[in-house]
Structures are given as C-alpha cells and as structure tokens.
Amino acid sequence: MSEVIISARDAQKISQISSQLPHALLVIADYGLDGLGVAQILAKNNDTFHLKPLPEKQTISIDQIRELISTLRTYAINRRVIVIDEADSMTEPSQNAFLKALEEPNKNTNFILVAKNPKLMLDTVRSRCQTLTLHKTTSAQDKKLLEKYNLDPASSQQILFLAAGRPLLIKELAENPEKFAEYRQLATDAKQILATNREYDTFKNLAKYFSDRQKAILLTDIIVNMIRFQALSRGMNSSLEGQLEKTTSVASALKSNANVRLALTQLVI
C-alpha cells in the first residue's frame, strides 16, 4: 500500500479509532483526501473485503449489496472488515438493503464506509455509523510531498495553489501533465470570473463546469482562495466581502448536492 498522507489533526483520532474499531464507521473525505487509504490503515491485519461502484454504472447496485449480505451470513472465525468505497454512490434501494447488515451486527464484522458527500446517504444509514471527517493537510505537508517530484518552482507553486491540502490531487497533478494543464485552466477561469463585470463572459466561463460537480467545487475553492489573497494584499472591502460570502455560499450548496448549474449561476446574479 502506498503512503497515506493525512492531516496531523486527524492522526490522533485515527489512532484512537484503530485501537477499538466501531461496528460501523463513516469516513468523510473531501475530493483529493485519502479516505480509502485511511480505511485500509484501520482495516490492517484483518480479513478485508472491498466493495466499490461498478465502472460501467458508477453506482453500487442492490445486487452488489445482496451479494455482500449473502457473504456475511457465513460464519467468520477471524475478524473481517468490509470497506465500502464511494459509499455515497449507493442507490437508495442499495442503502435500504444495506441497513439490514447494519441493524443485525455480527460481532466479528466491522464496516468502514468512505464517502465524499454523506448528504447523498440516507439518514438511517448515517445515524448507525460513527463519523470520522478528514481535514486538509498543512502547507508544510504539501510542500514535503511535492519535494519527491522533479518539478520547476513555478509548477510547484501552481500545484500547491490548485490542490492545497489535497494530497491525492497533488500527486495526480505532479504525475500527470495533461491533468495539470486541465487544472491550470481552472485557475485561469477563476481569475477571469473575478476580474470581469460582464455577466455574459462570466456565464460562459462557468458553463463548462455545469456537468462536473467536483470541478465546480474546486473552482469555487480557488475563487475563495483568490479573494482571501486579495484581501490580505489590499485589505478587505465591502466588494470583496460580498464576493467571498456569495462564493462560500455557492461552494456549500454544491457540496450539499444542489443543482450545479443553478448554484454556479448564483455567482453571476
């Protein structure tokens, strides 16, 4: 297993949970945070079963859950840990079926669910899980991670800005030039959105993100960072304060599964 980079503020809690793993744990990991890596740390030294969305469907189907439940009916001599990656991609019927496994605990079975957006999950599932919310890594951790790559200073600075606190994304941008170029465009668009007062131009820049929630969230994160940088450089004024409040509200809506198009359009209004 590759190195799992976690925030220092999460390390102690992960250690505590590891010493006494609950029946069901929900690991909430924002985009670019290594929720699956944390799950693997917690499941270490136990028989581990992995469940994730089918590539062709991008969801965890009810048939997958039924197969899991059938497997759980077999007697386990050793402790077994069921890791469900992208648990928020379970369909509603899948989650209802999964409730049976949560409601009928087996003393030798633990569940670790990893999710980016827990609000997509049923309250009845979430309420039966202990929650671990991962935090972004520090700038010092990010810089140390990038030292492993032979990048020029300009590229390193761009990656640190684009993927701040998200170690998996930092690795991806450092290792994949095409993905890096794609994300540099995010920064360009964010800068143009802040710079222009023309609604048509702003809307045109936003439109390319209507079909990609994760990129839309990253776009708003970058805009927020740019506004805060301007405030540090020139001081906060009513205009920047209004932009910050609006963008933060849009980012929150996107993370709560609001319609991407409608949420981003609020940046123009």
Kindly give the residue locations of the regions a language model identified.
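AAA+/P-loop NTPase substrate/partner-engagement loops
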Residues: 46-63, 121
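Short catalytic-loop micro-motif centered on adjacent basic/acidic residues
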Residues: 83-84, 133
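Conserved Walker B
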Residues: 86-90, 118
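Glycine-/small-residue-rich active-site loops that bind phosphorylated ligands and cofactors
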Residues: 34, 56-57, 90
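Charged, glycine-rich active-site and insertion segments that engage polyanionic ligands
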Residues: 1-48, 108, 116-269
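Conserved alpha-helical scaffold flanking the Walker A/P-loop in AAA+ ATPase domains
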Residues: 12-17, 61-81, 89, 93-100
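Structural motif
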Residues: 26, 81-83, 112
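Conserved catalytic/switch belt of AAA+ P-loop NTPases
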Residues: 96-113
